[in-house]
């Protein structure tokens, strides 16, 4: 049996409820999940849920939202942002309200300063990160490094990420991708 130290849900827009429930259990049992905007927004048939988002993952992620927008000159702020060259939110942003999580990054804008952009939630035995907007690669790298620390993975990454991509077939005959 393989133990996954850090799981990611990159814009996992359409997902069956059972997969989202497994992700909840994964974090509950000590895993570290990094999820991005629109994760779990619709079911496997691409039917958008009427529930407050991120619906099934809401407790695990410790956030909720029902508003999103397109950023125009929206900057990001927070300790983890300090010293990065590009602090701008890009392309898309969810307006996250806390429901147990701590804020790592806020929107620094007169309209959106009451909302979180990136959060971290200690849920049962594990941690869940939620990234509610597109951002600069340097800031994303910092957030991922923090998640690796929570998973007690140290000294495995060089100065820059070399990304290795592997494709396989799972037990259900579905393609799976691994980004290492």
Task: Give the location of each predicted region.
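A short, well-structured beta->alpha microelement
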Residues: 1-4
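A conserved amphipathic helix/loop scaffold
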Residues: 6, 11-180
């Amino acid at each position: 049996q393989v133990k996954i130290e850090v799981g990611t849900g990159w814009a996992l827009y359409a997902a069956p409820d059972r997969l989202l429930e497994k992700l909840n259990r994964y974090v509950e049992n000590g895993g570290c999940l990094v999820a991005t905007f629109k994760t779990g927004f619709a079911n496997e048939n691409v039917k958008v849920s009427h529930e407050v988002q991120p619906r099934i993952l809401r407790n695990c992620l410790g956030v909720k939202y029902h508003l999103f927008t397109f950023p125009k000159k929206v900057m990001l702020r927070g300790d983890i942002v300090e010293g990065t060259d590009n602090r701008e939110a890009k392309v898309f942003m969810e307006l996250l309200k806390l429901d147990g999580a701590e804020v790592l990054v806020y929107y620094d804008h007169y309209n959106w300063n009451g909302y979180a952009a990136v959060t971290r939630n200690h849920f049962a035995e594990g941690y869940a990160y939620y990234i509610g907007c597109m951002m600069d690669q340097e800031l994303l790298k910092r957030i991922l490094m923090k998640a690796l620390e929570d998973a007690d993975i140290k000294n495995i990454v060089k100065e820059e990420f070399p990304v290795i991509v592997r494709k396989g077939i799972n037990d259900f005959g579905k393609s799976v991708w691994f980004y290492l």
